[in-house]
C-alpha cells in the first residue's frame, strides 16, 4: 500500500493504563460508556501476554507481537549491565534513561527493531506527540529518547513532543545513576506551557505504596494527570491546529493502574482488593482526562477529522501472597517458610521464584539490582542472597549459580539462571542452558502450587508440561535476549457464584507490593481482558464488534485510516480491524481453539485458549487445569457421530462431536458442538459455540440467565433468550438465523451473514442484522441496526425505538393497524430508496411537521416517528407504504 496521507485525518490513541473491561459503566466512567453507545465497542478484546505495560506499549506503538519487539515484560534480562539502572542486567524499563541504554546496544539505536506509528507518521510530515506515563510514552517513538554521547550524554530535543513524569523543559538535569534524565522540550512548547499557566516540569505523582503494616494511597493520581491533560488541550493540540498539519498523538493515562497498584483500601485482605473506592477513583480520573480531550476536539471541530481509539494495556488483579485459591489454602513454597523484614509470616516475599529455584537446585543466589551505582561498571559483584538469614532480592530478580559477577559487560559464564520478576508472571533465562536443564527447571516449576502454565523457547524442543513460546507470539524477530521460559502464576476468583469472573480475579504475584493491592501480568482473563473502544469519522456508530481484537491491532487500524504503509522487519503483526470501519464488513469470521501440552510426570499440562481471525491469533487465557480464571479445558468430549444426551455440572466444558446432540447446561459452562443439528439449554456465565448444523440454543430456559454468549456458527440456527436477569450476547454468524429475546433487557443480538430474523419482546435491547436481507423486530426502547442488504425494521407497539437501516433499500414499519405508544426514531432514512411503512393508515391522516433538521410524522396528536436529517418538503407519497405489513 502506498502512502496516501491525503484524507486530512488525525488520530489519537488514548490508553487508560490497567482499565478492566468490566469497570466501564455509566456512573464511574460516563465518557467511556458513552463511546460504547455512540462508537465502536470491542467486546472481545485482548492484552498481549505477558500482560504488562511496556510489552503492550510496544505492541500499541508498532502493531507487532512481542516476539518481534523483544519487549517481553517491564523487567527483562538485557545481557549487559545498564548504567542507568546501577549496573543491573535485569533493569525495570519504565524509565527513559534505561530505554536509552538498551537502544544503544541494538541496530538503529532501536531495541524494538520495528517502526512505530508515531515515528513513521513523523517521517511523513505529521505532527506527533506522546504524553503521560513514564516509559510507555517514550516507547511510542523510542529513538527520540536516545542520548548524544552515549549513556552519559544528554537527550537532544526530540521532534516528537514527549511529556512524561521526568520532562522538565529546555534544561534537563544531568544524568543521575539509577534515575532518568529529563526529556527536553522545544522552546516553543516551553513558552506555550508558561503562557497557559503551566510549569515546564510536570506535577509529580504522590501515591505512596505503603508496606506490610501501613496502607498505601487513598487518592487517585489526579493532580499529575490534570497537568498532562492541560498540556495536551491547552498547548499541544492548539499548536497542532495552528500548524495545519495532520497529527498523531498518544495520551497515556497512568490511572487507574497507579491507583490500583498502590491503593490502601485492602491491606493484606483479598476483598475489596482493587474493587474499592481508591481504584474506582482512579478509573474515574482516567475517564475525566478522556472527557477533557474529547470536549476539546468537539469544541474546535477537530472531532470531524480525528479518529480516537481507546485501549488499555492490560487488565488487573488483586494480589495474593499466601492464599492460592478461594478457600484460603496456603502456599507450600519454601520461600514462604522463611522470615523476612517487611514480609508477613507465611507470605511469599518478592523474589520467591528465585529463592525457590536456588534452594531446589542447591545453587547460590545473587541480587542483580544494586541499590547504588558500582564504582566500576566493568567489574560488578552482585550481593549474595541467603533466605535463611532473612535476605531476599530487593526487586525480586535473581541470578542463580556462578559468582554473581559482571566482568567487562559479561555476566559470569557460570550463571545457570536469571529470573526477571515482574508480577503475575516471570521471565526465566538460561544463559548456558540446554534442553535437559530446561526440562529439569520445568519439572521443578510444575510442582509449585503457585504456577499455572509454562512456556518454553522453541529452541529446546518439546518439553512435557510446557507449550512453545511460538504458540503465544513470543518467538519472532526480537533482538533482545529471548526468555528460555515464561511462567504464569495462579489466578482465582473471589466471586462465589462465578469462578471465572475477571472482575474478581486474584493472582499470585512476584512483586514488592502487598497482598490486597493490585498487579497484572498473568494469563488469567482478568488480566488479558482489557478495554478497547473507538469513535470518530472513520469508525462505525453504535457497533459492537464480537470478533477478537488486541493491542497489536491498534496501529494497523490507524495506519489504514491514515493511508500509511509502515515498514516492518518481523512477521508477527496485528490486523486492521476493518469490520469496525465505515464501509467495512459487518463482521469477520473468527474461530476458537484449545491447545494443550503433554503432561509432566506429576500430571500437569499447559492449556492455551486462543482465537483466530485469518492468520492473526488472540490469546485469551492459559495455564494448568483449574488454576487460571477464564481458561477452557475440556471436561467432557464426544468424538463420535452418534446423538448424545448430556447433562453438565456447573463450570464444565464440553465438546459434543458431530451427532445431533441434546445438552442440558448449567452455570459457567463452555460448550462446543459439532456438525449435527444440536439443541443446547444453558444458564448464566456460559459460552456456547455451535458448529455447522441447524442448531437451537435456549438461554435462561430453566432460570433467568446473564453473562452468557451464544455463537451459532454455520447453519440456520435459532438462538433464544427465554428469560434474562442481566445482559447476554447472541451471534448468528453464517446462515439464515433467528435470534429472539422473549424476556430481557440490554440483550445484544448480531445476525451476521445470511438473511436473519431478530426479535425483541423485551426492552432496551440492541439488534444488529449484519449482511444479508434481514428482518428486525423491536418492542420498547430498542435499537435496531439493519446493516448491509435490503432490510425490514419493525417498530413495536411500545414505541421509543431507534431504527437505523444501513446500506441497501430498507423498510421501516412504524405502525400496522395500531399506533405506537411513543415516538420512534429513524436515523438514516434515504428518500427515494427506503420506505416508511404505515399499515392500515391513509395518507390523508398524516401530518408532516418540520422540527429543526428532522421531520415528525404524526396522526392527530400522536407522533409516530422522527426522521432525522430529513426535510418534510422533500418527502413524497412514494416514500410511504400504506398497505398491511409484509409480515402478518
Please provide the spans of the model-predicted regions.
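Polar, surface-exposed loop/tail segments
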Residues: 452-486, 546, 564-599
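Short, structured active-site-proximal loop/turn typified by the sulfatase FGly-forming signature C/S-X-P-X-R
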Residues: 22-71, 75, 127-131
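Low-complexity acidic/polar repeat-biased segments
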Residues: 1, 636, 845-888
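Beta-strand elements within well-structured catalytic alpha/beta cores of enzymes
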Residues: 8-21, 34-36, 60, 121, ...
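Secreted, luminal/periplasmic, and some membrane-associated catalytic domains
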Residues: 50, 76-83, 88-104, 292-307, ...
Amino acid at each position: 500500500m502506498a502512502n496516501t496521507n491525503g484524507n486530512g485525518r488525525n488520530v489519537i490513541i488514548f490508553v487508560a493504563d490497567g482499565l478492566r473491561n468490566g469497570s466501564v459503566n455509566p456512573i464511574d466512567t460516563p465518557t467511556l460508556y458513552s463511546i460504547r453507545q455512540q462508537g465502536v465497542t470491542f467486546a472481545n478484546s485482548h492484552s498481549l501476554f505477558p500482560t504488562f505495560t511496556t510489552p503492550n506499549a510496544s505492541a500499541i506503538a508498532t502493531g507487532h507481537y512481542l516476539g518481534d519487539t523483544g519487549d517481553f515484560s517491564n523487567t527483562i534480562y538485557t545481557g549487559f549491565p545498564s548504567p542507568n539502572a546501577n549496573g543491573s542486567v535485569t533493569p525495570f524499563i519504565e524509565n527513559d534513561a534505561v530505554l536509552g541504554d538498551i537502544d544503544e546496544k541494538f541496530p538503529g539505536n532501536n531495541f524494538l527493531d520495528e517502526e512505530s506509528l508515531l515515528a513513521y507518521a513523523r517521517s511523513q510530515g505529521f505532527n506527533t506527540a506522546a504524553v503521560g506515563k513514564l516509559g510507555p510514552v517514550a516507547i511510542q517513538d523510542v529513538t527520540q529518547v536516545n542520548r548524544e554521547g552515549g549513556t552519559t550524554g544528554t537527550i537532544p530535543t526530540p521532534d516528537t513532543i514527549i511529556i512524561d513524569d521526568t520532562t522538565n523543559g529546555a534544561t534537563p538535569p544531568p544524568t543521575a545513576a539509577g534515575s532518568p534524565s529529563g526529556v527536553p522540550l522545544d522552546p516553543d512548547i516551553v513558552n506555550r506551557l508558561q503562557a497557559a499557566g503551566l510549569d515546564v516540569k510536570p506535577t509529580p505523582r504522590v501515591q505512596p505504596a505503603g508496606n506490610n503494616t501501613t496502607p498505601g494511597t487513598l487518592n487517585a493520581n489526579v493532580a499529575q494527570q490534570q497537568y498532562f491533560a492541560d498540556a495536551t488541550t491547552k498547548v499541544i493540540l492548539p499548536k497542532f491546529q495552528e500548524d495545519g498539519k495532520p497529527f498523531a498523538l498518544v495520551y497515556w493515562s497512568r490511572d487507574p493502574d497507579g491507583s490500583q497498584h498502590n491503593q490502601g483500601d485492602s491491606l493484606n485482605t483479598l476483598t475489596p482488593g482493587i474493587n474499592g473506592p481508591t481504584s474506582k477513583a482512579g478509573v474515574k480520573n482516567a475517564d475525566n482526562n478522556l472527557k477533557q480531550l474529547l470536549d476539546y476536539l468537539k469544541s474546535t471541530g477537530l472531532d470531524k477529522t480525528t479518529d480516537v481509539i481507546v485501549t488499555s494495556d492490560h487488565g488487573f488483579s488483586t494480589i495474593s501472597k499466601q492464599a492460592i485459591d478461594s478457600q484460603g489454602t496456603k502456599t507450600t513454597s519454601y520461600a514462604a517458610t522463611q522470615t523476612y523484614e517487611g514480609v508477613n509470616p507465611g507470605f511469599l516475599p518478592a523474589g520467591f521464584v528465585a529463592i525457590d529455584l536456588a534452594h531446589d537446585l542447591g545453587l547460590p543466589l545473587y541480587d542483580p539490582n544494586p541499590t547504588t551505582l558500582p564504582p566500576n561498571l566493568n567489574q560488578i559483584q552482585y550481593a549474595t542472597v541467603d533466605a535463611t538469614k532473612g535476605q531476599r532480592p530487593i526487586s525480586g530478580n535473581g541470578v542463580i549459580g556462578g559468582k554473581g559477577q559482571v566482568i567487562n559487560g559479561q555476566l559470569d559464564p557460570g550463571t545457570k539462571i536469571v529470573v526477571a520478576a515482574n508480577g503475575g508472571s516471570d521471565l526465566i533465562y538460561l544463559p548456558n542452558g540446554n534442553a535437559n536443564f530446561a526440562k529439569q527447571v520445568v519439572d521443578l516449576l510444575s510442582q509449585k502450587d503457585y504456577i499455572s502454565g509454562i512456556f518454553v523457547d522453541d529452541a529446546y524442543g518439546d518439553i512435557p508440561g510446557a507449550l512453545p513460546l511460538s504458540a503465544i507470539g513470543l518467538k519472532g524477530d526480537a533482538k533482545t535476549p529471548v526468555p528460555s521460559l515464561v511462567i504464569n502464576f495462579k489466578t482465582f476468583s473471589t466471586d462465589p457464584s462465578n469462578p471465572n469472573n475477571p472482575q474478581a480475579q486474584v493472582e499470585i504475584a512476584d512483586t514488592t507490593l502487598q497482598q490486597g493491592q493490585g498487579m497484572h501480568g498473568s494469563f488469567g482473563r482478568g488480566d488479558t481482558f482489557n478495554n478497547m473502544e473507538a469513535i470518530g469519522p472513520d469508525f462505525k456508530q453504535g457497533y459492537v464488534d464480537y470478533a477478537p481484537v488486541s493491542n497489536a491491532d491498534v496501529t494497523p487500524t490507524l495506519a489504514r485510516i491514515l493511508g500509511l504503509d509502515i515498514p516492518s522487519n518481523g512477521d508477527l503483526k496485528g490486523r486492521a480491524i476493518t469490520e469496525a470501519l465505515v464501509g467495512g464488513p459487518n463482521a469477520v469470521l473468527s474461530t476458537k481453539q484449545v491447545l494443550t501440552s503433554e503432561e509432566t510426570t506429576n500430571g500437569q499440562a499447559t492449556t492455551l485458549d486462543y482465537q483466530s481471525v485469518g492468520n492473526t491469533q488472540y490469546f485469551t487465557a492459559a495455564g494448568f487445569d483449574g488454576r487460571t480464571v477464564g481458561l477452557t479445558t475440556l471436561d467432557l468430549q464426544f468424538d463420535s457421530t452418534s446423538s448424545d444426551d448430556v447433562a453438565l455440572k456447573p463450570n464444565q466444558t464440553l465438546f459434543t462431536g458431530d451427532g445431533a446432540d441434546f445438552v442440558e447446561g448449567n452455570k459457567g459452562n463452555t460448550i462446543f458442538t459439532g456438525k449435527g443439528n444440536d439443541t443446547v439449554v444453558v444458564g448464566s456465565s456460559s459460552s456456547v459455540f455451535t458448529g455447522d448444523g441447524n442448531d437451537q440454543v435456549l438461554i435462561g430456559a430453566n432460570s433467568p440467565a446473564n453473562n452468557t454468549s451464544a455463537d451459532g456458527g454455520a447453519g440456520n440456527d435459532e438462538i433464544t433468550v427465554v428469560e434474562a436477569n442481566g445482559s447476554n450476547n447472541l451471534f448468528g454468524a453464517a446462515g439464515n438465523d433467528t435470534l429472539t429475546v422473549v424476556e430481557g433487557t440490554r440483550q445484544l443480538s448480531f445476525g451476521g451473514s445470511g438473511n436473519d430474523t431478530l426479535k425483541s419482546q423485551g426492552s432496551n435491547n440492541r439488534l444488529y442484522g449484519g449482511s444479508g436481507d434481514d428482518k428486525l423486530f423491536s418492542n420498547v426502547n430498542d435499537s435496531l441496526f439493519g446493516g448491509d442488504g435490503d432490510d425490514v425494521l419493525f417498530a413495536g407497539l411500545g414505541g421509543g425505538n431507534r431504527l437505523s437501516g444501513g446500506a441497501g433499500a430498507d423498510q421501516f414499519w412504524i405502525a400496522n393497524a395500531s399506533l405506537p405508544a411513543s415516538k420512534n426514531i429513524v436515523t438514516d432514512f434515504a428518500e427515494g430508496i427506503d420506505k416508511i411503512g404505515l399499515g392500515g393508515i391513509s395518507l390523508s391522516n398524516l401530518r408532516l411537521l418540520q422540527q429543526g433538521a428532522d421531520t415528525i410524522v404524526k396522526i392527530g396528536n400522536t407522533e409516530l416517528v422522527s426522521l432525522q436529517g430529513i426535510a418534510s418538503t422533500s418527502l413524497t407519497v412514494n416514500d410511504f407504504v400504506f398497505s398491511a405489513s409484509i409480515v402478518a
